[in-house]
Amino acid sequence: MPDIKLPDGSIRSYEQAVTVAEVAASIGAGLARAALAGKIGGQLVDTSYLIEQNADLAIITERDAEGLELIRHSTAHLLAYAVKELFPEAQVTIGPVIENGFYYDFAYKRPFTPEDLVAIEKRMAELAKKDIPVSREVWARDDAVKFFLDLGEKYKAELIGAIPADQQVSLYREGDFIDLCRGPHVPTTAKLKVFKLMKVAGAYWRGDHRNEQLQRIYGTAWAKKEDLDAYLHMLEEAEKRDHRRLGKQYDLFHMQDEAPGLVFWHPKGWAIWQEIEGYMRAVYRNNGYQEVRCPQILDKSLWEKSGHWEHYKDNMFTTSSENRDYAVKPMNCPGHVQVFNAGLRSYRELPLRYGEFGSCHRNEPAGALHGLMRVRGFVQDDGHIFCTEDQIESEVTAFNALVKKVYADFGFNDVAVKLALRPDSRVGADDVWDRAEDALRQGLRASGLEWTELPGEGAFYGPKIEFHIRDAIGRSWQCGTMQVDFSMPGRLGAEYVGADDTRKVPVMLHRAILGSLERFIGILIENFAGALPLWLAPVQVVVLNISEKQADYAAEVAQKLHSAGFRAEADLRNEKITYKIREHSLNRLPYQLVVGDKEKADGLVAVRTRGGQDLGQMPVDVLIKRLQEEVVARSGTA
């Protein structure tokens, strides 16, 4: 006779074992209709799950975050069901949930077309409308392998074959379609009402370019139609803001086939870069960091000692010379340990903070490259703090405050914090990971921050705090990180002399605020739709003469602004002033200064803001003071 405790603290008693669906029905007909799954002891289960003992139970509906993930997961299966009905020869592989949706990979003899996607989506809607029950079945592993091989589903059979033979596997059936899955799933296809297929892209089996190429169909699914509409509107807005298009339009950078994943910065784009690097260099200096510079290429043996070779070699570029093997650095941390090791260190020097604008290279798959957002060569505002274990909390707390300040200066005030915990592939003993994870939690508590935890998402050498900024159209971008590492310093021989005159191994904190500068610039371009705030704008002020008679004065004003430290240009073309104003307005320049005969005679400029506001005439010195105040405040221009 199980007693079921509900989230409101009430307890319901039942005379016999009861399913999650039956509990929901006993509470109310509305909840029974809305139930998608249950949550028992923190674990999600199907509504058909039989509760035989006392338990704490929450009924999951579309209002819960877990409910939306269930909808997306189940819609991925619905997609596979529809594809198999329309294209029986297609083989199914995997179909996980991703941010804002899902995808499913298929092996098929020809590319899926846009017309195919329309047909597949239509069939999905038909299957959903049929209200087909979704049920869980438990099979012996070998029986499941044989079943899928008999169906000609070699990929699914391979996945199941990798499971230990003595383990059972769970399969989910809906109508004539059956798929491998841990679950849970929605109880019926009728729960899947709001979805849209987005695109087809290439993928490789198991993510390895040496394997067969597959076709990946992406989709999105939501609980309500208005949520889908809002998401599609956001995508339209994101397309308008695409940094690749704006980068070309505003002459900031380009990329080309001869250097995949590498950036050619144009003068205007490099001006943005230099401004950001200068700002972050001041952040280093003002917060006790010593800037260092380490080699691009290091002997393979060092990467073996650090653990990178074992856990990261597939993402590393390598080269050989004079019978020695080298790797181009994908990360800066081993180099910073070498700087630490170059002298005898004392506990009195700790915490010792190193910062570097470290140029790194990672061999990302060609299909994953995406403008500035995913590159093969990038620079990080990277830093490493060598400290004692009892200094971790204060260092993490100080860093958390610094991150908040930096993001605010760039216009990002909505920051979510996540704690990524130990992955399956890692270095170090579990007790070391326990200490590292607890140290980060303590630092977050001391900062008064709320966070969510991400099991299995940490780096191979340590857990990490992730800082996710939200942009102007609601997208979340993970930028900053703080990681505690008890392993790498010892692996690379880092030591200091403690207060008791014994040699001790320091703790190493890996930290970055912006992350990849390339990616952060891409985020900035899209966040501001190219209209960067004054302090970041590649051209801050343009001076426009009305006629040839004011050309010398316009050039003089531009030079005065330039001498005051501003990125200023003079547009002296023999064009109508309305044409020049319109052109520079389209280029989203923060300020336009118009000079005619009156302005020249009185030593003034007529000032227009990016938003079209007319600030009237003013002396150049007054304008310079205004601009200086705006730059110091890091505020945007209307």
Curated annotation (Swiss-Prot):
GO terms for biological process: threonyl-tRNA aminoacylation. The keyword Isomerase does not apply. GO terms for cellular component: cytosol. Residues 242-533 are annotated as: Catalytic. Gene3D superfamilies: 3.10.20.30, 3.30.54.20, Anticodon-binding domain (3.40.50.800), Bira Bifunctional Protein, Domain 2 (3.30.930.10), Threonyl-trna Synthetase, Chain A, domain 2 (3.30.980.10). Its EC number is 6.1.1.3. It comes from the Bacteria. Pfam families: HGTP_anticodon, TGS, tRNA-synt_2b, tRNA_SAD. Keywords: Aminoacyl-tRNA synthetase, ATP-binding, Cytoplasm, Ligase, Metal-binding, Nucleotide-binding, Protein biosynthesis, RNA-binding, tRNA-binding, Zinc. It is found in: Cytoplasm. Zn(2+) binds at residues 333, 384, 510. It is an enzyme of class 6 (ligase). Residues 1-61 form the TGS domain. It catalyses: tRNA(Thr) + L-threonine + ATP = L-threonyl-tRNA(Thr) + AMP + diphosphate + H(+). InterPro entries: aa-tRNA-synt_IIb, aa-tRNA-synth_II, aa-tRNA-synth_II/BPL/LPL, Anticodon-bd, Anticodon-bd_dom_sf, Beta-grasp_dom_sf, TGS, TGS-like. The keyword Thylakoid does not apply. Binds 1 zinc ion per subunit. Its cofactor is Zn(2+). GO terms for molecular function: ATP binding; metal ion binding; threonine-tRNA ligase activity; tRNA binding. Catalyzes the attachment of threonine to tRNA(Thr) in a two-step reaction: L-threonine is first activated by ATP to form Thr-AMP and then transferred to the acceptor end of tRNA(Thr). Also edits incorrectly charged L-seryl-tRNA(Thr). Homodimer. Belongs to the class-II aminoacyl-tRNA synthetase family. This is Threonine--tRNA ligase. It comes from Dechloromonas aromatica (strain RCB). The gene is thrS.
